[in-house]
Structure formats: structure tokens, C-alpha cells
Amino acid sequence: ILSQIDEYNRQFDEVNAEILKLAMDGIDTQYIGGELAWPVPGYTRITSKYGMRTHPITGVYKLHTGVDIGAPMGANFVAANDGIVVKAGYNGAYGNMVIIDHGGGIQTLYAHGSEITVNVGDTVKRGETVVLKVGSTGYSTGAHAHFEVRINGVTTDPLPYITNGVVPSSENQNTEQTNTTASE
């Protein structure tokens, strides 16, 4: 299992390096500003917040780089803002994942999908374009939506960027992982 963890960490580092390269290449998009849309319409229960936690699979205490949203297999995972798909495919710990560049150094990542519904180069619309179907691929203990916000290639807590009338459920919003039924 340690070799698998090392491989997942290597793949994670590759994704981050690719994101930084794409950011440096200046993809021709412009961030339209404002808040990001809630990425899983109809599902607001956060099962794990951004921050330090004990990983439910590896048992390692480390940064959880996004938020996990409890949702059933096959639920729609939508673009949080207008942008261009810069990565769509399988990536180790993330499983099936999509990265969207919104311009201005802002990117969002959607992971653990059962089905990818966009391709690299596709233009997506805020709240309208389905980028993934919720699933449990990669390092996952159950169906859920893992959502990240990256500013200039660095992950940050997504919640301050999300407001469109959705107030996430307060269930299990501590930074320590206590419910491992649907987490990365």
C-alpha cells in the first residue's frame, strides 16, 4: 500500500506541476469575477472541509485540499464558473477528474466522478455545464463530490468563494474527518 501512496502522491505532484505550467502559459480566458456557483445542485451536505485531517484511507494526517460534498452516484457536478477545460481524465487519488481554468489565475478541480462529460478545450458555462457525474473513483470511500479552488496553482478553502444562495449544511463541518463514508 505504501507504493500505491507514493504513486498517488507522485501523480498529485504531476497535476500541480501541470496546473502551474498552464497558468504560466497564459491560457486565453478571463475570470468574470464574482462568486462561484455551488458545484452540486441540490446537495449541500459537506462531509469533509478544506484543512488538515486524518486521511480516511491512508491514516496520514495531511491537508485535505478541497471540500467533499455528499451526493449520490450519478448526480450532476457542474462548472462553478465560465471557463475552459484544461484537464479531463483519470488521475490516481483523484480518480476521474476535471480542471477548469477561469482566467486570472483561478482554477477549479472536480474529482472522483463516475463519468467525465467534457473534453480538454471545451468551453463551459457557470452552473450549466455538467463536467462530471458524481462517483467514487480514485482514493474514495464512497460516492461524493470533491471540489477544489486553486489560486495561481495553490489550493485554498473553496467555501469563501461560493455563494449563490446556497448555505451548506453544518453537518460535520469540522476540519477533522469524522465521517469517512464519502471522502477523498
Which ranges hold each PLM region?
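Catalytic cores of peptidoglycan-degrading enzymes
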Residues: 34-180, 184
